[in-house]
Amino acid sequence: GQFLEDPSVLTKEKLKSELVANNVTLPAGEQRKDVYVELYLQHLTALKR
């Protein structure tokens, strides 16, 4: 997959589906988009370095 340096360009739904697809556990309940952006940066963007 193509992991973005700036995941904030994605929609929240897209962020969530990308995280789930990469076996990242989502926080319970509905979070602000920046929560998912942070998870994406921690788990996905970091993987490609």
Curated annotation (Swiss-Prot):
Per UniProt, the keywords (alphabetical) are:
Hormone
Q: Pfam families recorded for this chain?
A: Thymopoietin (PF08198)
Q: Which CDD domains match?
A: LEM_like
Recorded GO molecular functions are: DNA binding; hormone activity
- Check the record and name the SUPFAM superfamilies matching this protein: LEM domain
Source taxon at top rank: Eukaryota
- Region Biological activity: list its residue ranges: 32-36
* Sequence ranges assigned to domain LEM-like in this UniProt record: 4-47
Under the heading SMART domains, the entry gives: Thymopoietin
Role description? Hormone of the thymus with pleiotropic actions on prothymocytes, mature T-cells, the nicotinic acetylcholine receptor, and pituitary corticotrophs.
Concerning its family, UniProt says: Belongs to the thymopoietin family.
What protein am I looking at?
Answer: Thymopoietin-1
